[in-house]
Each structure stands twice: as C-alpha cells, then as structure tokens.
Amino acid sequence: MVLLAFQNTNGGLPTSMRREAGDIRDIWSRFTTGVAVITTIEGGPDVAAGGSSELSPLTSVHGMTANALCSVSLDPPLLLLSVGVGRRSKKLIEDKNRFGVNFLNTMQLDVAVNFSTSDPRLHQSKGLDYWYTELGTPMIAGSLAYIDCRVVNHFEVADHVIFIAEAEQFELGRGEPLVYYERGYTGLDRRDD
C-alpha cells in the first residue's frame, strides 16, 4: 500500500496543487471524451427542411468541434453544451435557438480538425455532405449519431455560455467513435479479454 502525504495550506488545498490556467488545461487533457461537431445555420431565414440538401443562397452551415457537452436528463431528454462567449457559434445558437449535435466516428477526423478552430475563414463546410432534419437543422452525413436540439435555457458562467437544450429528434449512425485525449484525436482500442 502506498500513502501520499500532502501539506495543507490555509485553504485546505495541498501545496503541490496549483491553480494556473495551463495546469488546469493539462488536467482536463487527461479526461477522455467523445468528439462532436455542433452545427447551426448562418444567415437565413429560409433553410432547408425535411431532409433536403439545398440551402437558400443566403444561408450557410456553421460548425464547431466540441467535447464540452453532456446528458442532463433522460425524461425529458436534455443536454448541456458549453460554448465560449467569444465564439461565433454562441451567437448563432442564441439567434436560431437550436443546434445539431453530430457525434463523429473515426473516419471523420478531418471534420473534427476542420471545425476545431475559432477562425471562421479556415472552416471548409462546402465540401462536406450535410442533410437536414424536419426542423431544418443541418447534420453532417456519416456521423455516429445525431441530435437535433432546441434551446430551453442558457446562462453565462465566467468565460462560457451554458446552453440547456431538449433533444427533439435523434438518430443513430454507424462506425467507431472518434475520441479526444491529451489534446489529440484517436479511436478506441477494443480488446476481447
């Protein structure tokens, strides 16, 4: 048995524990998550609906790679999405009051990388295949799973906005999940032990 001893400070935290931004990023990099792209419509108001793949000339699909989301409730089906206050996606989600969640599979690494930057000039959504839900939300074809969400509440916390959304439509796709760990993308190494 190994015992670890820490010397406490006034706040009760071990002296070896720091609270610097870089340190907390390192901690969170060890938390393995799935990878999703959050999709919204930019422009409008006329969008494709009912599975059509045609957008009005005044609209385009906007995406943001995310792993800061989680299930909140199963009945009703609610989820939580955290978006930085300076992100373009934040404004688009607030404006449209809905968004799509596309869980990516291992064959969609390029999609994850494409939408992982906050610089919209680097997004290449035109070459990707999309389909649209009955409610007009864009979804990335070939994803592992899809959720069409309607925002029911949102609030600002520090440098992020927390969106609580109801999953109004959802569908399973196929493939193996793309995973994010230590600031990199990978797949699962499934072993039959």
Language-model-detected regions and their locations in the chain:
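Basic, polyanion-binding surface patches
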Residues: 2-193
